[in-house]
Structure formats: structure tokens, C-alpha cells
Design a protein with these regions (language model features):
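Glycine/Thr-rich beta-alpha phosphate-binding loop at enzyme active sites
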Residues: 22-37, 242, 246-342, 377-395
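Glycine-rich phosphate-binding active-site loops on the catalytic face of alpha/beta enzymes
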Residues: 75-87, 240-242, 359-389, 691
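Ferredoxin-type iron-sulfur electron-transfer modules and their immediate structural context
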Residues: 317, 323, 328, 374-375, ...
């Protein structure tokens, strides 16, 4: 496929809009239109109905982008920058992919990739279309929006024929062929509006934002702005770079907020506009604008240049935006506001989004333009929520900025969840699967769960208050809802698409709500299953894996006995994990679910040997012993293994520790041990780890809980010896990454001491190898469903994997049960578990933090009902939804609209690139020849060229060998969506 996008002819563009709106009530995939309320804000002698719009960038480069943004609520359009370098010359300088917006944003775009006259035509097309659409569809006043030019990068280029003509034609488009064509097409489409159309103003733009390259001298910036004010008579904003803050300020802010991995040096700070030069220049330009009766202000801010060091994007430098840029930009606003006593107008771009937009507007900072937030799932749809939030505030002409409020905003941003980077690197959001060509909607949470729980379905049931059905659905795959609803590692939440909005849906908490509210009804409905003949199972180990296996077997009709050496079932969660993590009462309820099915439980003595069990008639035996042996630290001194020590502590009823306790390790068990030590009276509790907290295997939440309770953390330390109330440690540093991807700790040769009377070794747990050996089981040798080398003996959970999570143990238990029973468990999902497509679509673009677990289904995006992340995140609208007659939504990639920015790749839940891997609609033979994508080209009549496994020309009126789903999709495109390719 080609990275070159090309404009859609205006008649085709309008045909698309009119057809889609009439059929779906949508425009370019934006689901919900914004209808203006009548409130307006004056600016540049014009009015805007909302203070928002797309910043100069990918969301304002094509007519369809601008129209989509307007439909969602944008009314101020900073159209993409033009300069003397354009078209193919510029495109060759932009590597692909060029956008990375999965978290904080990065890009390598500059100005428009179109030729300047093409860009001009796109803006004129959008201007004319919006004049009519606003009136015909009742979206707002035809005079309720403003187009703001962005030009760069030097005065010579701006005064050159190419850019100068662009400026003149944007100021008055009446003599351009494009403006005349637009009026003719619109009159043809809306003849009843011919008089209105004839009166559309050709003054597309009366204002400009000056964009300069890094290192541009202050004298050049002033010359450009002065020229635009005096020679062109344009209201003018000057865009400033974050480098004006100074290297030390920028580095300190970003480091303190977790962005210490972002690399940049001082050269841009030294070469860019300096504060001492900027202030008097802005004063002169303000005075010049005032003398001409024009408005002047500052655009804060430009993106921030940083180094590419982790293969984020191709090349060596990229430009940072989004949530990490906000604290820098708002600090710039604070300094400017104070310097000019609130009288300098500020146009904002630099991490604005739903959670801060109202505060910006209330402080007098507007217009507010956005890019990164609308490059994420929800896309342009996010604008409506921002508009609705600020509509509640008073609208009035600019009368100054509130310096105190802006200063408070700046300070607060340093600790704001929405701008802080998590301590640990973000987990992978994608699955390992490739995206299907069709029928690709999937719930990534479900794929991230080892037992593939029906998460969206039970979330919906809980949202509806159907707790009994929700718990029944949960226990079809998970017989430990209380345990997993409390301490599950919840990898599902790492995959949740809501992470791209605000925060993951609280899936684990919702499961616990279902368990607590649906338990009675479920217990009342359960009864033993009729027994299968000839099968009798013994389970050695009564921890989570053993309990789960017994549940699955008994449900399937297998006579089952579980053997546990301790007095009660529950394993490590009951005897080791502290009560503040999981209560005995919760465990008892999970055990009761299993017992309800008729499982025989034998506790308080070691299990018989495998041979003895076979002689007792057991046909299938499962080794489900937990990892009870602590890893050996191997240093001299007073050292205890974490498992035995925590078991001992759990038996204590009051604080019993004295002195200083050091826990060596960095997993969740280490966090638990450190918290236990603190709660049991230790003078101090310290975690010692040979790497840094970023490399810790522990959940970030568990680390935070430990630190909040007063546990100390010593990083880059390896214990050597404990003696005389001290722990001697080697000072470590991080070297090259090891096989796990974490950087290896390397000793520096220096040592130090910390107070320590007792060392707890929490460096990993092991299974009792002696028990395995006594039964002839060879560790590590596994067959189907984890069968061991001993006939009819299986292993699961810790005994199979080494230290495993509870849910991994459940997955093993399910596989074992299926092998014994001989078939997979089947069940039905209630109809009430499926939301309507319209309800799922209505959630797109809505940001909302968690409030209560019972309401989390309302935040669930129902990705398996409607995903469309690639549709939302494409600024050019190159991924479109095709709705089949049977109600399915299919994604089709429209090749001509794509410039391979790569943004859709970041948000596809599969290990795939929608722009390359989804079924593609081609415009020309040349386009198809330059691409390897699977897709179709309509050749006229019934003839098509289609590429799947082979590339062929077919006649749709004749029998063919196309897969039925593909043929249906092609016929639907031709029948209902021909506007995608006809010109």
C-alpha cells in the first residue's frame, strides 16, 4: 500500500456525507452529532459556538477530518500548517509510522503532506461544506465556527509565491476554482438553499498562527508576526516551544512525574526562543496588533522535541505531546499569565482533554485545540463530552486569564493521576493473535484472562443488577469467585481497552460484587451431578488449584476426593496470605461451592501415595500441591524463608516482632511480608531489591500499599551478610537487559549497610520436589493436559508451572477436568448479558473514572459487541464500518485516505496493523499494485479485482469461489457504500 493519501473530490465527499447521515445519522463514523445551544464566544471579529477544535496536525489536514470534528462539537479549526516544502518532497522526510499515541503522544509529522494548493482546497471544501451542513442539519449557526491558518517556517518561505497565494486565497477564496466548484455542487445537492449557498462568505480565514522550527531566531519570529499583522492584516497567534521554560525546569517536572526515561539534551533549550527575548518581543507585537485593531496572542505550546531511544518511532528525534506535555504547557501558561498580568491571550494546545478542559476554559484560556486525545479510541467522538462539560460555564468575550487559577492548575498537574506516569512500564495491551480479515470484534480482557472468562457479559449482568445470573456465568469457568474477586492478578485489566481512555474497568471488583450478592441464589440452585461410571479422581492438595479441579470434576459427574494435609482447605491463601488480603470467610464460601457438588474432603493428614490411591480405585490422580518452599537466599545471618515465616505470623493474634526486618525480594509475596512485618510491630520494615521499582514483578498497587503503610524500599541492593543488627549490601547498577527483558543488576564494587535484625527471603517459592520424587514423578516432564511420566497422574498449578497465579491454577484444573471427563463443559449465556449495539456505541468517546464496582459495567466498552478502535483512532477516517444485512459490523480499510501514520496499529487489540491487515478497498489499479493488502478494486459493472490467497479478476454475476462472508462484504460495499469509491 502507498503512504500517499489523496483528497476526495468535493462531490464525492458530499455524496458520502449526505448518504451516511440519511442512513445512519452519522458523518464519517462520528456517532453522535453536537447541536449548538445558541451560546457563542467572540474571536477575531467572528464567533465560535464552542471553544474547542483540532490543533494543526493530523486531525485538521483533510476536509473529512475537519467535518468530522465539527460534527462532534469542534468550532475552532487550526488547520494543518503549510510551508514552502510540501507534497512528495516533504512526505519523503516523514518516516512511517509517524504517530505513536498509545499513552503520551509522539509524532514525526511537520506540516501538510499535501501540496499547498491541495491543502488550500481541502480547507475551502471543509469551509463550504460546514456552512451548509450547519444550516441544513440544524447543527448550529453557519457563522458559528472559525478557521485559523497555521503557516511556517520562515519569512522568506511565507512571502514566497506558494504560501503567499495560499494566505491570500484563504483570506478571500472567491476567485478560486475550488470555491466555485463547492458552491455549484452544494446548489445541486441542496437546491432549496441556493440563495443561502450563493451568499457563503469566501473569507475562509481571518487569522493565523505562526509556527517556527526549533532554533528560529527571535528576530525572525518577530518579522514573521509583524508581516502578518501589518501586510496581511491577520489576527495573529505566535506558537511558543516548551523549551522556553529552560532545561532544568522541564527535566525536573518530567522526572518528578515518572517521565525520567524521556531523553533530551540542552541544545534545543539553548537555541530556541529565550524568556528574556520573548517578553519584550511579545509586548511589541501586542502593541502593534492593538494599533491595527487586531488581536494578538500566544499559542501554548508546540510539541516538545525528544530523542528516540527505545524504537518508539523510526529516526532519531520525535515530538512529544499529550498528557506528559500538559504540565510543561500549563507551567508556560502560568508564567505568561503572571508576566502579562492576565492580559495576554493564550490559545492552548498541549495535553488538553476532558479532565482538564473546563479548568482551562474557566481560567480564561481559549480557544483550546486538541490532537493526542482524539487520536485515541473514541476519536472525534471525545469532543462532544468536552463541549458539554464547558457549556455549563459562562461564555463571554476574552477579558483576561486567571493567573492564580492557572498557577494552581500547574502545581496540581504534578500529582494528577491523568498526567502521572505509572511507576512500572505499561504492560502489553495486545494479544498474540493476528486480526481476522472479517468478524474481528473481540474483548481483549477475555483474551488476557488465562481462563477466558466471559467478562463483558458478566459485567453487563452486574450492571443490570442480575447478580445471581452473573455469578452463575462466572462460575462456569471460575469456581473461586471470592478468591479471584479479591486477590486475582487480573491480567484482564491490563488488556482492557478502557486503559486508552482513563483507567481500566475494575473487573476484579465487579466479580466480587457478583459473588457477594449472588452467592445465596447460586448455592440454592446447586446440587450434585449424576456420577459417570468408571471414573474416580483423587486430588492431592487443597489449595486453589485443587479446589477448582474438584469443582470441575464433580460438576462433570466424576466421583472426586480431595486430600489436604492441613486442617482446612485453602492452601497458601488460607495459611500464608495475610488476612488483610483475603479473609477465611471468603475462602470458606468458595470451598462451600465445591462441597455443594458432593466432593469428598479429607483434611488433616498427608495424602496416600499414588500407588496406594490407585489400589483404592482412583483412576485419575492430580498433583495440585502448592509452592510451599521458599527460595534460598544463601547469605549468612538470621534468615527465614517467607512462606514459613508468614505462616507463623498468621497464627499470631497480636504484634510479636521487635527490631528491624528486611524483606529481600520484589514480588507480591515480598510486599505482603513487608506489610506483615510492619503490622506485627517491627521497628522498621524494609524491602531490598537488586533492581529498581520499575523492574519489580510485584503489582504496582501492592507496592504502593506497602509504601503507604510505612515500608521502606531500598533499590539497587543485593544482600551479602546479616550480622550485628546490620545487613551488608552490594550497591548495584543496571546493565544490559536479560532474557526477561529487564536490565541485569551489576555490582558496582561498593557496599553499604542498613539496620536489620531479621532477613526474610522472598526470592521465589518452589514445589516440594521430595513428594514428587517419592511418587516417581519427574519434574518438568509433561504430556497432554499436564500428564506426568506416571500413568494416570497429572499435575497442575504450582506443581505444573512453578509458582503460579490462582487463575493459572484454575486454567490447569479446567484442562485436567476436561481430559478426565472427555469433553469440554458447555453452557448458555443469558440474553441479558449482551448490550444492544446502540448502547455499546454510545459509550465510545466518553471518559469516566470508576465510582462503584456495581456500576463498572457502564464503563465497560463492550468491545466484543462493537470495537471499532481502528475506526475511531484514524484521523483521516480511512477505516470505515460496513454494516451487513445480518447486523454484523465489518471494518474496511479505504486505501486512498491512508498515509500509513500507524496510529490505528496502537489500538487494535490484535498483534496486527489494521491499515495493512484488514480487508482493503482500492481506488485504482496503481494503488492495488503498490499494495500487498488483501482487498478489492471495483472495475465497473460486475467486474472486480480481488486479492485473497491469489489475485484475480472476477465477475460477480457469475459463480465464484470467494468465501461467502467476503462475497457478502463486497456486494454490500457495492450496494450500500459505493460512495467510498465512486468519483
Amino acid at each position: 500500500m502507498s503512504e500517499k493519501m489523496y483528497p476526495i473530490p468535493f462531490k464525492s465527499l458530499m455524496n458520502w456525507i449526505v448518504t451516511e447521515y440519511a442512513r445512519e445519522g452519522e458523518i464519517f463514523g462520528v456517532h453522535t452529532p453536537y447541536y449548538a445551544t445558541g451560546k457563542t464566544l467572540p474571536i477575531f471579529g467572528e464567533t465560535i459556538e464552542t471553544p474547542f477544535g483540532p490543533a494543526a496536525g493530523p486531525n485538521s489536514q483533510l476536509a473529512q477530518n475537519i467535518i468530522a470534528a465539527y460534527f462532534a462539537g469542534a468550532r475552532f479549526f487550526e488547520v494543518k500548517t503549510v510551508q514552502k516544502m510540501d507534497g512528495e518532497e516533504l512526505a519523503r522526510c516523514v518516516p512511517r509510522p509517524c504517530i505513536l499515541a498509545a499513552d503520551e503522544g509522539y509524532n514525526q509529522e511537520w506540516s501538510t503532506e499535501l501540496e499547498v494548493p491541495q491543502a488550500q482546497n481541502e480547507y475551502i471544501k471543509a469551509w463550504c461544506a460546514l456552512k451548509v451542513l450547519s444550516k441544513v442539519y440544524g447543527l448550529g449557526s453557519p457563522d458559528g465556527f472559525v478557521f485559523n491558518m497555521s503557516v511556517g517556517y520562515d519569512l522568506e518561505g511565507i512571502k514566497g509565491e506558494k504560501v503567499n497565494s495560499y494566505i491570500d486565497n484563504m483570506m478571500d477564496a472567491s476567485n478560486t476554482a475550488q470555491f466555485k466548484e463547492c458552491l455549484a455542487v452544494l446548489t445541486e445537492l441542496f437546491p432549496e438553499e441556493k440563495d443561502f449557498i450563493a451568499g457563503i462568505s469566501p473569507r475562509v480565514s481571518r487569522s493565523v498562527t505562526v509556527s517556527t522550527l526549533h532554533g528560529c531566531p527571535p528576530q525572525e519570529i518577530e518579522r514573521i508576526a509583524s508581516y502578518l499583522l501589518t501586510e496581511k492584516g491577520l489576527h495573529t497567534f505566535v506558537k511558543c516551544n516548551p523549551t522556553i521554560l529552560g532545561y532544568k525546569t522541564a527535566r525536573t517536572i518530567l522526572d518528578s512525574m515518572g517521565y525520567d526515561y524521556i531523553v533530551f539534551d540542552e541544545h534545543h533549550f539553548n537555541e530556541d526562543l529565550q524568556w528574556a527575548d520573548a517578553v519584550p518581543m511579545f509586548e511589541r507585537l501586542q502593541a502593534l496588533a492593538d494599533s491595527r485593531g487586531l488581536e494578538f496572542g500566544l499559542k501554548l505550546s508546540n510539541t516538545f522535541p525528544v530523542d528516540t531511544t527505545r524504537n518508539e518511532l523510526p529516526g532519531t528525534e520525535m515530538y512529544m505531546s499529550g498528557r506528559s506535555l500538559f504540565p510543561l504547557t500549563i507551567e508556560m501558561c502560568s508564567r505568561i499569565s503572571r508576566q502579562f498580568n492576565g492580559k495576554m491571550r493564550i490559545s492552548f494546545a498541549g495535553g488538553a482533554e476532558f479532565f482538564n478542559c473546563d479548568k482551562l476554559f474557566a481560567a480564561g484560556i481559549w480557544p483550546i485545540t486538541v490532537a493526542t486525545t482524539i487520536l485515541k479510541p473514541g476519536g472525534y467522538n471525545r469532543l462532544a463530552q468536552m463541549v458539554e462539560k464547558t457549556e455549563k460555564l459562562p461564555y463571554h468575550a476574552f477579558n483576561g486569564t486567571d493567573s492564580a487559577a492557572i498557577s494552581d492548575m500547574s502545581a496540581a498537574s504534578h500529582s494528577d493521576f491523568h498526567h502521572l506516569k505509572p511507576i512500572k512500564p505499561l504492560p502489553a495491551r495486545k494479544s498474540e493473535d493476528k486480526v481476522p480479515l472479517i468478524d474481528c470484534f473481540t474483548a481483549p480482557c477475555k483474551g488476557g484472562c488465562p481462563i477466558h472468562q466471559d467478562i463483558p457479559e458478566y459485567m453487563e449482568l452486574v450492571r443490570r443488577g442480575l447478580y445471581g445470573p452473573a455469578l452463575k456465568l462466572i462460575t462456569e469457568k471460575n469456581p473461586l469467585p471470592f478468591l479471584t474477586g479479591t486477590i486475582c492478578a487480573h491480567r484482564c485489566q491490563n488488556k482492557c481497552s478502557r486503559n486508552f481512555y482513563d483507567e481500566s474497568v475494575h473487573i476484579r471488583d465487579t466479580k466480587l460484587v457478583a459473588a457477594e450478592h449472588g452467592y445465596g441464589a447460586l448455592m440454592a440452585s446447586m446440587k450434585p451431578t449424576a456420577k459417570l461410571p468408571g471414573k474416580k479422581a483423587a486430588i492431592i492438595g487443597g489449595g486453589p488449584t485443587g479446589i477448582a479441579a474438584a469443582y470441575f470434576l464433580a460438576r462433570g459427574g466424576v466421583e472426586t476426593t480431595i486430600f489436604e494435609r492441613e486442617a482446612k482447605l485453602g492452601g497458601v491463601p488460607r495459611y500464608v496470605i495475610p488476612a488483610f488480603r483475603i479473609s477465611d470467610e471468603a475462602l470458606d464460601k468458595d470451598v462451600a461451592l465445591m462441597e455443594r457438588l458432593g466432593v469428598e474432603v479429607k483434611c488433616g493428614a498427608p495424602a496416600p501415595s499414588v500407588e496406594a490411591l490407585k489400589k483404592l480405585g482412583y483412576t485419575h490422580i492430580l498433583m495440585a500441591t502448592g509452592a510451599w518452599q521458599a527460595g534460598e537466599l544463601g547469605i549468612p545471618g538470621t534468615v527465614k524463608g517467607v512462606i514459613g515465616w508468614m505462616k507463623e505470623m498468621k497464627q499470631q493474634v497480636k504484634p510479636c516482632l521487635e527490631g528491624h526486618v528486611v524483606v529481600v525480594g520484589a514480588g507480591n509475596t515480598a510486599m505482603d511480608a513487608a506489610r506483615v512485618a510492619k503490622r506485627m510491630g517491627a521497628a522498621s520494615s524494609t524491602i531490598v531489591y537488586r533492581r529498581t521499582k520499575k523492574e519489580m514483578p510485584a503489582d504496582e498497587h501492592e507496592l504502593k500499599l506497602a509504601i503507604d503503610e510505612g515500608v521502606k524500599l531500598v533499590e539497587l541492593a543485593a544482600p551479602v551478610e546479616q550480622k550485628d543488627g546490620k545487613l551488608v549490601c552490594n550497591q548495584m547498577k543496571l546493565g544490559e537487559p536479560d532474557a526477561s527483558g529487564r536490565r541485569s543488576p551489576v555490582a558496582t564494587g561498593e557496599t553499604f549497610e542498613i539496620p536489620c535484625d531479621l532477613v526474610i527471603s522472598a526470592i521465589g517459592e518452589k514445589v516440594d520436589a521430595k513428594l514428587m520424587a517419592e511418587n516417581g514423578i519427574e519434574m518438568g516432564r509433561k504430556g497432554p493436559a499436564f500428564q506426568t511420566n506416571v500413568e494416570n497422574v497429572w499435575s497442575a498449578g504450582d506443581a505444573h508451572r512453578g509458582p503460579a497465579t490462582v487463575v493459572e491454577g484454575i486454567a490447569d484444573a479446567a484442562a485436567f477436568a476436561e481430559a478426565v471427563i472427555g469433553k469440554a463443559h458447555t453452557y448458555e449465556i443469558p440474553e441479558q448479558a449482551y448490550p444492544a449495539k446502540a448502547d455499546a456505541i454510545a459509550k465510545k468517546g466518553i471518559l469516566k473514572m470508576a465510582s462503584c464496582a456495581c456500576c463498572e459495567g457502564g464503563r465497560c466498552l463492550d468491545c466484543n459487541t462493537v470495537c471499532e478502535n481502528c475506526v475511531d483512532s484514524c484521523p483521516n477516517r480511512a477505516n470505515v464500518v460496513v454494516k451487513l444485512a445480518d447486523g454484523r459490523h465489518e471494518i474496511v480499510h479505504v486505501d486512498k485516505m491512508c498515509n500509513e501514520c500507524g496510529n490505528c496499529t496502537q489500538f487494535c487489540p490484535y498483534a496486527s496493523e489494521p491499515c495493512h491487515d484488514k480487508f482493503t478497498l482500492f481506488q485504482t489499479e496503481k494503488d492495488m499494485n503498490e499494495s500487498e493488502n488483501r482487498g478489492v478494486l471495483f472495475l465497473g459493472g460486475d467486474k472486480i479485482r480481488v486479492r485473497l490467497e491469489k489475485d484475480e479478476v472476477l465477475d460477480l454475476s457469475q459463480p465464484n469461489e470467494l468465501p461467502q462472508d467476503i462475497e457478502t462484504l463486497i456486494l454490500t460495499i457495492r450496494g450500500k457504500y459505493s460512495y467510498l469509491y465512486t468519483e
